[in-house]
Structures are given as C-alpha cells and as structure tokens.
C-alpha cells in the first residue's frame, strides 16, 4: 500500500498557529529541494520553478538540492542544469543514496566546493541512452546524430565540472561506471563526503 506524501506541522512566519503542510512544502521553506525520483518533465518543471522562486526571494542564500535519483530524461535534466547555472544563489548538491546518470550530472553541477555526498552514497556515470523504435532509417540516423551531439556536450561539461580530461570522461562513460562517495570525491564529481548537516 502506498504511503503517500507525509504532512508535517509548520508555522507560517508571523503566525501564532501551526498548520499541516506536505513535507516538500516545509523543506522548500528552508530552501531545501529534493530530487527523489526519475528525472522527467514534471519533476524538472517543479524544480526549475522552485529554484527560480527561491533565487528571486533571496539570491544571497544557498539552495540545497538533495539527490537520490536513477537519472532519466536528458532534456528534462538539462532544463534543471541550465537553471542551476542561471540562478545567482549557490546550489549545494547532496547525494543521499544514488545519483546515477542525469542524477550524477546534476550532482556534479552544484557550486564548486559545495557538491557533497553522504558516506554510503553511490554515484554512476554513463553515456546518454537512446531508443530505436521501428522507424525509417533516415529518422534513426537523425536520432543517432542527436544522441552523439548530446553525448559530446555532456562529456565536455562533465570534464569541466570534474577536472578530468574529455578523453577520460568519454572512456569512463562508455559503460556504467559506479563510484563510492570517496571515489566520486577523488574523481572530482563531488567536493566532500559529509556525515552531519553542519558540514554542508
């Protein structure tokens, strides 16, 4: 049986009474966002809107993005990535559990020095996936060119974010490449492994 979204008590600023709100609303009030599912257009639109709102409220305060995601849509993920780079607020990214594929890309896109992971996190990078359905050969060729273009763009960005060479990123992402939190730190995907909120 599904659990649903938990509710928690929250006192609005200036109010003497508490009310029950969903946990994500409460976390958002503390500038905490959570990517806890596959990246798709819906979650991307929600995260983009929340980042834009929080940045417009106070761009001097960081936004915390917790990630436990198997990855997902490249185009949806790039919408999140572009917004992370667009806002003035620092983006503190924190891996809790798994950051794979686009999840790992977004983890490493946080503000340099503020890309974090909990000790038992797993990070996985690989090349973008593309599907081939029963279509005309010319359509498949067009899609293949686009996938290769996206792969090159993602590899260049990841090389820049990690400090690794483009050639190393290209080689390592040829297949699923899993790293522990400590290995991800040494690789340059994150900056620190943390065990307590005060370390973020």
Swiss-Prot record:
Location in the cell: Cytoplasm
Job of this protein: Cleaves peptides in various proteins in a process that requires ATP hydrolysis. Has a chymotrypsin-like activity. Plays a major role in the degradation of misfolded proteins.
Enzymatic reactions: Hydrolysis of proteins to small peptides in the presence of ATP and magnesium. alpha-casein is the usual test substrate. In the absence of ATP, only oligopeptides shorter than five residues are hydrolyzed (such as succinyl-Leu-Tyr-|-NHMec, and Leu-Tyr-Leu-|-Tyr-Trp, in which cleavage of the -Tyr-|-Leu- and -Tyr-|-Trp bonds also occurs)
Listed name of the protein: ATP-dependent Clp protease proteolytic subunit 2
GO molecular function: ATP-dependent peptidase activity; ATPase binding; serine-type endopeptidase activity
Active site: 101 (nucleophile), 126
Organism whose genome encodes this protein: Prochlorococcus marinus (strain NATL2A)
Entry similarity comment: Belongs to the peptidase S14 family.
GO cellular component: cytoplasm; endopeptidase Clp complex
Assembly and oligomerization: Fourteen ClpP subunits assemble into 2 heptameric rings which stack back to back to give a disk-like structure with a central cavity, resembling the structure of eukaryotic proteasomes.
Record GO biological process: protein quality control for misfolded or incompletely synthesized proteins
One Pfam family of this chain: CLP_protease
This enzyme's EC code(s): 3.4.21.92
Keywords of the record: Cytoplasm, Hydrolase, Protease, Serine protease
PROSITE patterns linked to this entry: CLP_PROTEASE_HIS, CLP_PROTEASE_SER
Stored Gene3D superfamilies: 2-enoyl-CoA Hydratase, Chain A, domain 1
């Amino acid at each position: 049986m599904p659990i649903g979204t938990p509710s928690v008590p929250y006192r609005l600023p200036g109010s003497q009474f508490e009310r029950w709100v969903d946990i994500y609303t409460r976390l958002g009030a503390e500038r905490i966002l959570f990517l806890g599912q596959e990246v798709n257009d819906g979650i991307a639109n929600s995260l983009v809107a929340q980042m834009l709102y929080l940045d417009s409220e106070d761009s001097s305060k960081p936004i915390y993005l917790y990630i436990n995601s198997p990855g997902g849509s490249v185009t949806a993920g790039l919408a999140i990535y572009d917004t992370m780079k667009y806002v003035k607020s620092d983006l503190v990214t924190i891996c809790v559990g798994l950051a794979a594929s686009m999840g790992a890309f977004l983890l490493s896109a946080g503000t340099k020095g503020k890309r974090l992971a909990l000790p038992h996190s797993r990070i996985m990078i690989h090349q973008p996936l593309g599907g081939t359905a029963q279509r005309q050969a010319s359509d498949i060729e067009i899609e293949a060119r686009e996938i290769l273009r996206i792969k090159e763009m993602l590899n260049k960005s990841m090389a820049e974010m990690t400090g690794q060479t483009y050639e190393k990123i290209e080689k390592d992402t040829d297949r699923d490449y899993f790293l522990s939190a400590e290995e991800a730190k040494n690789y340059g995907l994150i900056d620190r492994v943390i065990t307590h909120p005060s370390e973020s």
